[in-house]
């Protein structure tokens, strides 16, 4: 199981982008599958300097 709250942000970044690319249509599908709060996940990535790019279905450095 993925610990979205405490996993190292770089590992989480890599893992989430891989899951988005290979297994999920979009971020909503991913958070629903794992039972994760979307806003909390977005905030965690935003604090680390990443933003979800809906058009590319991945997080990118901003």
Where is each model-derived feature located?
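A signal for specific C-terminal beta-sheet/loop modules enriched in small/flexible residues
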Residues: 10, 61-62
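Short acidic, Pro/Gly- and aromatic-enriched capping/linker segments at domain boundaries
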Residues: 36-50
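Short, acidic, Ser/Thr-enriched surface-loop or helix-capping motifs
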Residues: 54
């Amino acid at each position: 199981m993925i610990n979205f709250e405490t996993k190292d942000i770089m590992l989480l970044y890599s893992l989430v982008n891989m899951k988005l690319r290979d297994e999920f249509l979009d971020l909503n599908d991913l958070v629903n599958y794992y039972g994760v709060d979307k806003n909390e996940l977005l905030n965690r990535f935003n604090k680390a300097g990443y933003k979800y790019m809906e058009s590319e279905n991945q997080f990118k450095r901003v």
